[in-house]
C-alpha cells in the first residue's frame, strides 16, 4: 500500500482529496490541524507519530523532522543500498507529500503584526519535507497547491502520473519555497521602498515587497523610466490582474483603478488598437498592460500617446529603443503567469479584511437565457467579453461591449441607472451586436428600459432581485435577449 503525508495550512479541498486517495489505496498520515479535519470527516488517517514513534513536541515545532519521515521520502528506489538501509531501520517508503506552508505572507501583511507572531509563522518542517520530496521527484509526488489536486487524481486514476509530470510539480515546489524564503528575508530585512508621496502629495508612502514573484507587480523588472509612484503601483496591479484573464491577445488600459478600454484581437497590435479606440480620451496618462510581447510596430503605436506605465511579458530590443525615447515612461516586464495567491487584504481602522480573490468564472453552459429572445452568437461573444471585464470595474458598474472591445464603461456610481447612463452616453457605438453587462442585479426594470431606449439588444446580469421578473418583462417588451449568470461581481 502506498503512503502519503498530508500537512496543510490551506485546507481547501483537502478532505475530498484525502478521501479520493484512500479509494486509490493510499495509506494517509497527517499532523495537527490537518489530521483533526480528516478525523472529523471520517477519513482514515494515522498520525505521523505512528511513523516516527516519537511525539510532536514544543507546541508542534518538531513533528516531521525525523529520519523515519525523511528517509522514506528521500530514498532512491533504484539503489539497493538505500532500500536495504530503510529495511534495516524499519522505515517505510513515502510516495506522496502534500504540504502547504504556514501563512507567513498573510501574517506579516497585518501592519500590527508582532515579531513573535511573525516568527511563529515561519514554517520549518513543511519546507523541509517539500524540498526533500521535490528533490526525489523521480519517485515521489509532491503537491503544494490545492489547484493541482484534481489533475493529480485524474492522472492517478488513469495510471498516467509519470516522471515528467512529477518534475513539473517539483518546479512549483521550489518556486513556492523560494518565494516563501524571500518573503521572510524581506520582512526581517525591512525591505521597503520609500515613494515620493502617497495618493496625494501631502501623504507619505512606501512600498513593502512581501513577495518577489516575477509574475507580480512586486517582482516586475523595470526596464526604463522614473520610479513608480503609489498610484502607478495600484493601477498597474489592477491592470495586470485583468489582462491575465485573457488567453487571446489582449490589451487593458486603466485610469484610477478602473478599466477605460479593453480590447482583444488576432494580434496584439489589433488588441491595442481596439483598447485605444474604446476610449481614446481616457487612455491619455493611463496604465496599459499587454499579454504579448511588444513589437516595434506596437511600440510605435504606444509611443504616439502619453502613458504612465506600459506592462508586457517582453519588449523586443527594437521596441525598447522606440519607447525609451520618452525618458519618463515606466516599462515593466512581467511574467504573465496567473498569481497563485488566493487571498487579498484590505486594511481598515483597527484591523484588516481578508477574502478570496474574485476569480470565479461562470461557465457559459451554466448561464441561463431568461427571455423569449436568445442571444446571437456575436451577442454571446460580446457578453462573455464584458463579463470577464466587469469584476475589475468599481461598483455599481455597467459595461457595454462588442466581441472585440469594451465600447462604454460606467463605473463607481451610487445607483445602477446612473452607471448605465454614463456607459450609454460614452459609448463609441451601439448596435445589435453590443451587449450591456451589469456587475449586480437590477432592482427594478428601469435600467433595462433605459438600455432599450438606446437600442441595446442583449443584456447579461447576475439576477437575484425579488423583482427580476420586472426586468425580464421589460426585456421581452423590447425584444432584448437577457442572460442571467447567478454570480455577482461587486468591487469596492
Curated annotation (Swiss-Prot):
Please give the organism: Staphylococcus aureus (strain Newman)
**Biological processes, Gene Ontology terms:** 'de novo' IMP biosynthetic process
**Keywords for this protein:** Hydrolase, Multifunctional enzyme, Purine biosynthesis, Transferase
What NCBIfam families does the record tag this protein with? Answer: PRK00881.1, purH
Record protein name field? Bifunctional purine biosynthesis protein PurH
Specify the pathway. Purine metabolism; IMP biosynthesis via de novo pathway; 5-formamido-1-(5-phospho-D-ribosyl)imidazole-4-carboxamide from 5-amino-1-(5-phospho-D-ribosyl)imidazole-4-carboxamide (10-formyl THF route): step 1/1; Purine metabolism; IMP biosynthesis via de novo pathway; IMP from 5-formamido-1-(5-phospho-D-ribosyl)imidazole-4-carboxamide: step 1/1
Protein family per UniProt: Belongs to the PurH family.
Reactions accelerated catalytically: (6R)-10-formyltetrahydrofolate + 5-amino-1-(5-phospho-beta-D-ribosyl)imidazole-4-carboxamide = 5-formamido-1-(5-phospho-D-ribosyl)imidazole-4-carboxamide + (6S)-5,6,7,8-tetrahydrofolate; IMP + H2O = 5-formamido-1-(5-phospho-D-ribosyl)imidazole-4-carboxamide
Task: Decide whether keyword Hydrolase is in the record.
Answer: yes
A Gene Ontology cellular component where this protein is annotated is: cytosol
For this chain, one GO molecular function annotation is: IMP cyclohydrolase activity
Q: Which InterPro entries match?
A: AICAR_Tfase_dup_dom_sf (IPR024051), Cytidine_deaminase-like (IPR016193), MGS-like_dom (IPR011607), MGS-like_dom_sf (IPR036914), PurH-like (IPR002695)
Q: Domain comment text?
A: The IMP cyclohydrolase activity resides in the N-terminal region.
Domain called MGS-like: residue spans: 1-144
Enzyme Commission no: 2.1.2.3, 3.5.4.10
